[in-house]
């Protein structure tokens, strides 16, 4: 019973007849409170059907100048990525066939800028690299590999590591282990591995060797990307990279095996099974390189190493699989197709 009704009953119970014995006229019902009126309105509305919803305002028009470029299902700006890849491929082919020493120059520039990207990335985690000796020593390692081969590379690598440690000593003992360890890691990861691409290019058939190496790595990326987007269902390493799937890896294996057989049989005139092994070695190394780069970026809590290359990120985002594959390609091609 509502409070208004109980109050009304209380008034009626205390009403006494007048002197003539007649009952007094009944009091007029008090107006319903706002709460009661709202409740009655809801009940009535429920009986008659819910009122029509209010029209939603139309979204504001998107300015074509500020609209973001559409991305592919894999999260990349595919047209920009293809354009950059074609431009880089044209640059590499030009250096290999017009003036091969210029290929070493391009690799040296990539090492110097990649060192800068890595220094910025590691700085976000309060790990400060010895950038100057890494960049200068890295370029020296590329030059030594071109001029003196593996022996020159080994000497330049040793001197660069010593220079990195001495440079860091000048900054004091605070975080020395973390900074020095990160700096030595970068020396081994970037210029030391990039130097193997220069070693591939140095022989008389170096252009063919570099193209076989880069094209097979590209087949790994393309095969994994295409099959992963179309058929990818089972993540390979979800903790490290959600984009890697076993279906994509199978596509990489297929594409790399075919590319390896074609290059080893048609270009180097070797047995087909050597091409299969070459392709398998490249695809496994490229996949591990991608995952390793993803681990580094997760550790540093960054998405990309930079933004120099539209659709790819930074230089290091493009070199993630090429760097370790350069060393593997050099070893396998030296074993399977020795220089005459």
Regions found by a protein language model. Give the residues of each.
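Membrane-embedded alpha-helical bundles of polytopic integral membrane proteins
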Residues: 2-5, 14-22, 28-43, 47-49, ...
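Generic detector of well-ordered alpha-helical packing
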Residues: 82, 118, 222, 291-294, ...
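Short helical (or helix-break) motifs at transmembrane helix termini and adjacent helical loops
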Residues: 217-229, 285-298
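Membrane-embedded alpha-helical segments of transport systems
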Residues: 220-223, 250-251, 316-326
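Hydrophobic transmembrane alpha-helices of multi-pass small-molecule transporters
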Residues: 256-257, 318, 325, 334
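Interfacial loop-to-transmembrane junctions
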Residues: 299-322
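Juxtamembrane boundary at the C-terminal end of a transmembrane helix
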Residues: 331-340
């Amino acid at each position: 019973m509502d409070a208004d009704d109980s109050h009304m009953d209380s008034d009626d119970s205390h009403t006494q007849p007048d002197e003539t014995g007649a009952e007094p006229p009944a009091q007029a019902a008090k107006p319903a409170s706002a709460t009661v009126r709202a409740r009655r309105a809801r009940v009535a509305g429920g009986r008659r059907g819910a009122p029509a919803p209010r029209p939603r305002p139309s979204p504001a028009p998107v300015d074509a100048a500020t609209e973001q470029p559409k991305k592919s299902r894999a999260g990349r700006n595919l047209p920009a990525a293809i354009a950059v890849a074609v431009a880089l491929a044209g640059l590499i082919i030009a250096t290999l066939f017009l003036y091969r020493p210029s290929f070493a120059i391009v690799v040296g520039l990539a090492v110097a800028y990649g060192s800068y990207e890595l220094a910025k990335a590691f700085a976000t985690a309060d790990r400060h690299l010895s950038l100057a000796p890494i960049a200068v020593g890295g370029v020296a390692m590329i030059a030594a590999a071109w001029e003196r081969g593996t022996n020159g590379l080994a000497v330049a690598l040793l001197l660069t590591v010593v220079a990195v440690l001495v440079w860091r000593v000048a900054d004091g003992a605070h975080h020395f282990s973390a900074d020095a360890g990160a700096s030595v890691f970068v020396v081994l990861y970037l210029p030391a591995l990039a130097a193997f691409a220069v070693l591939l290019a140095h022989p008389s058939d170096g252009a063919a060797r570099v193209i076989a190496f880069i094209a097979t790595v590209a087949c790994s990326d393309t095969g994994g990307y295409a099959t992963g987007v179309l058929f990818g269902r089972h993540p390979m390493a979800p903790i490290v990279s959600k984009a890697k799937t076993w279906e994509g890896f199978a596509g990489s294996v297929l594409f790399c095996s075919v590319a390896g057989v074609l290059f080893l049989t048609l270009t180097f005139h070797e047995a087909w099974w050597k091409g299969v092994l070459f392709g398998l070695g490249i695809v496994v190394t490229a996949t591990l390189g991608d995952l390793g780069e993803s681990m580094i970026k997760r550790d540093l809590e960054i998405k990309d190493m930079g933004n120099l290359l539209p659709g790819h990120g930074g230089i290091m985002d493009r070199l993630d699989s090429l760097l370790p594959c350069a060393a593997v390609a050099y070893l396998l091609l030296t074993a399977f197709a020795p220089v005459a």
